[in-house]
């Protein structure tokens, strides 16, 4: 049972809410959808309490999930595991106190986060590998000609190659890409 996306649907279980109905980027979209955000938060909390799982695994999305973790710690005895740790090393580092208080186990896909959480904040974290890196490594092993061919075909042998990463969500790309390509 989960609030999630297409990949979670593919492996089974019951989807309560698709993440596309939960994620809003930017000040104005969040403001315009505040009622929906709070309704989704309430529904999630009620669903967890009604279902009483043995553990809740939160995945990424700290704006929503840290609130769920806080609720679970205050109102239930359900253990909270957090996969893809909040990027507090990039911003909102103060959230470490909430993580320490509300999260039982933290799992990271970035190896440097182990040192950040354990050495700097004395909070244990499990590095579990990075599925994106694994996929890229596998793809490149199966298709070694792809990148080399691209470089050769576009005469980029001696030129720097720049990755333009506008975001992972449609709204981020829509908002960021026009500014990035100027």
Where are these predicted regions, by residue range?
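Short acidic-capped amphipathic helix/loop micro-motif used as an active-site/signal-coupling element
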Residues: 178-181
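Active-site and donor-binding regions of nucleotide-sugar-utilizing enzymes
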Residues: 1-151, 165-172, 176
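Charged active-site motifs of nucleotide-sugar-dependent glycosyltransferases
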Residues: 156-163
């Amino acid at each position: 049972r989960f609030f999630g996306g297409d990949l979670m649907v593919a492996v089974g279980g019951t989807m309560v809410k698709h993440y596309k109905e939960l994620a809003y980027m930017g000040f104005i979209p969040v403001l315009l959808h505040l009622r929906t955000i709070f309704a989704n938060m309430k529904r999630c909390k009620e669903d967890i309490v009604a279902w009483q799982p043995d553990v809740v695994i939160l995945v990424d999305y700290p704006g929503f999930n840290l609130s769920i973790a806080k609720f679970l710690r205050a109102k239930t005895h359900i253990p909270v595991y957090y996969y893809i740790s909040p990027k507090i090393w990039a911003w909102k580092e103060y959230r470490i106190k909430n993580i320490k208080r509300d999260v039982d186990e933290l799992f990271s896909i970035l190896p440097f986060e182990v040192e950040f959480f354990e050495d700097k904040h004395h909070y244990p974290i499990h590095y579990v590998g990075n599925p994106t890196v694994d996929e890229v490594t596998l793809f490149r092993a199966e298709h070694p000609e792809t990148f080399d061919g691209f470089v050769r075909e576009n005469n980029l042998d001696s030129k720097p190659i720049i990755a333009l990463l506008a975001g992972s969500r449609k709204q981020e790309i829509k908002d960021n890409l026009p500014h990035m390509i100027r």
